[in-house]
Amino acid sequence: MSIRRFAREAALQFLYQDDFIPESADTPGELKERFEQFCEIYQVNKKGRTYALNLIAGVLADQEAIDRLIEEAAVNWRMSRISATDRNLLRVATFEINFCDDVPAEVAINEAVEIAKRFCGDESPKFVNGVLDAVKTLCQK
C-alpha cells in the first residue's frame, strides 16, 4: 500500500472518530497532539502521518465549504443522510480535488473508490465515484 493511501485511510479514520466528538474545535497544536495520540493508539505508520495531518487539518479548516460542495454534487442527498464513513471519505477526496494541486482529480477519485471498497458498504464505491465525479466537474467551473 502506498504511503499516501495509508495516509488517506488514517485521515478517514481520524475524521470518522472526530464526528463523534462534540465541538472539537482544536487549535493547530491541539489537533496535532490529538492526531499523534490517535497514531500511537492505532499504530499509524510514521511515513504517512504528515500527509494525513495535512488532509485532516485541511478538511477541518474548510469543512463548511467542502460539505456545501458535496451536497451540491450529491443531488437529493443531505450530508446527514450520508453514512459517517462515506461522508468523511468524500470530505478527504473533495479536499484533495479542490485544494491539493499535486493530486490529479482522477487520482483522488480512484483512491477514494478503492478505500470505499475496503471501509464502506457494498454500494459505497459507486456512490463515492458518482459524487466525486460531480465534485470534479463543479471544481472545474
UniProtKB/Swiss-Prot annotation:
A GO term, aspect molecular function: RNA binding
Domain of life assignment: Bacteria
Per UniProt, the keywords (alphabetical) are: RNA-binding, Transcription, Transcription antitermination, Transcription regulation
Gene Ontology cellular component list: cytosol
For the keyword Transcription, the answer is yes
Mention one GO biological process in which this protein takes part, according to its record.
Answer: transcription antitermination
What the entry lists under InterPro entries is as follows:
NusB-like_sf, NusB_fam, NusB_RsmB_TIM44
Would the keyword Transcription turn up in this protein's UniProt record?
yes
Report the leader peptide range: none
Protein family per UniProt:
Belongs to the NusB family.
Free-text function comment from the UniProt entry: Involved in transcription antitermination. Required for transcription of ribosomal RNA (rRNA) genes. Binds specifically to the boxA antiterminator sequence of the ribosomal RNA (rrn) operons.
Quote the protein name from its UniProt record.
Answer: Transcription antitermination protein NusB
Species annotation: Desulfotalea psychrophila (strain LSv54 / DSM 12343)
Q: Which gene encodes it?
A: nusB
